[in-house]
Amino acid sequence: VFILLAMSALAGRALQLQAIKAPAYAASAAKKIQQAYDLYPDRGQITDRNGTVLAASEPAVLVFADPLMISRNGVDERVSMGPLETQKAAAAPKAIAKVLARYLGGTPEDYREMVTSRKPDGTLARYSLVRKHVPSYTYDLIRKALAAGKWYGINATHDPVRTYPSGTLASNVIGFVNQDGVGAGGLEYSLNKQLSGTKGRESYEASTYGRIPLGRDTLVPAVNGTDYTLTLDASMQLTVQNALASAVANTRAASGEAIVMNVKTGEILAMASMPTFDSSKAGSATGNEMINHAVQDAYEPGSVQKVLTMAALADKGLVTADSHLVVPPSISSGGGTIKDAFSHGTLNLTTRGVIAYSSNIGTTLLTRKMDKATLARYLRSFGLGLTTGIGLPGEATGSVPGASMADFTRDQISFGQGLSVTAVQEAAAVAAIVNGGVYHSPTIIRSARNGDGEQVKVPGSASRRVISAKASAQVRDMMEAVVTLEPDRAVKGYRTIGKTGTAQRIDPSCHCYRGYTASFVGVGPAENPSILTYVVLNNPVKGHEGSGVALPVAQQIMSVALPRYGVEPSTTKAPRAVLEYQP
């Protein structure tokens, strides 16, 4: 009877295990042996227009530990360990921690918790992060050292690291990624979602001995990020950065920015900011070094703004290059007085002469012919007071007075004070005025391909006519007189046009004018404008006039840019510029 009762009890327990609790035990077992980890995509590559790599992903791995495997040093839990295996397993955490410290840095104690970590329920974990972005060659050394000691439980998965082969080249445009590989500045930030791609996931059945052959596996592949080709030309960018860096150093300016643009398309060929930084060492950069001054800084442009003023006046038929104007020594404005930077008596100037001599008085008198609402509309049509849509983070809008501006404000903005712009806004506006009158929104992205290699649509340049071709020709005539005024302003072999700018700067600490912004915009060739260069130096200490400190920099850049982009030397001489007239 006793034997029958015992057999009955065992049969009941077997029934409970097999029929009633079997699903729960199976699920628990599956959970214990299922291993899963993320698959990291390659971040999209960024290159210049000619294929020079500016940002890329290099092979690296994410190193992780399997504490359960380490606790048995790879011996399958279904196998009983002998004395030697038990002794080896007991030594594994310490030995593996020493190997990790040797190749990853730190002390063995830094890794002990990683190789022995437990889940909330107290059981040993199957996954413990050790280090991200470990160079592949470093992991190879770790793997070989572990194999030599017959230690198990350290694994790795693809985890590419971001590199910037060109260092500081275009770093204020490209930006950088943070320690987690997330874009934190420049295009790396604004295009982070597209560049990042999509993580994948792999799961498989594993024992403490490792992956179970023919076990249940699932794989969702990672999708690599989108590759971007920029409009930038790395060679031109280097020329511009070197020229700008020298100018900022020589003048002891607080900062500087320079742009080279194709006036017929709006493509940015170079965009430099100084001081700058190395994208691969962003952690040691200062705030001033990381700012893209060409996009993020708004400033009063000074006399370069006269190009925009004359374009509006010429388009309305209020002036031509040969219009006559009597320019007195000074004029009253808003309870104050407007004077020119040079002392003079009464002058009889053409409009061409007003621009060549950069007369604030002459510009103000001519601007008073136009009503304020019309002037405000033209400035808006030229893109001032609005972001350009270039796609770079932190773009400033600047500030432009509206139709209700005071008379004194109208007078000021005519010659570039009382409003603020960014360098990219001003460059795009001047490009529109000299190219025949069509505004092309500036672009920095040329093309893109997704992780599958398929072409992806990118925002193109939006175009609109802002002045007539006739008005454009009149303004080019005026701007050529600026260059021919002095023999050392020309670019050897080319007829070019340009405009100097010297503006007082507002000091926020006192809300008063203190210091200067010196600038020059140059375009070539005069006969068929193609390439624009705009240089701005903020608060230079040694010299402050645009003609003295910014013009030579633009001249140096243009002497390289014009032949580089296939612009043939000029075969004609500039026409005689009539600047003054006899009454």
Enumerate the language-model features and the residues they cover.
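Short, small/polar residue-rich loop motifs at catalytic or cofactor-binding pockets
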Residues: 33, 38-42, 199, 252-256, ...
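Hydrophobic alpha-helical transmembrane signal-anchor segments
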Residues: 1-24
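Beta-lactam-recognizing serine transpeptidase/beta-lactamase-like catalytic domain environment
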Residues: 55, 206-217, 262-303, 308-539, ...
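Second-shell loop/turn segments in exported
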Residues: 32-36, 66-70, 76-90, 97-101, ...
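Conserved, well-ordered alpha-helix/loop/beta-strand core segments that scaffold catalytic motifs
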Residues: 212-256
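Solvent-exposed, polar/charged alpha-helical surfaces in well-ordered, non-transmembrane soluble domains
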Residues: 94, 98, 102, 132, ...
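Short extracytoplasmic
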Residues: 34-59
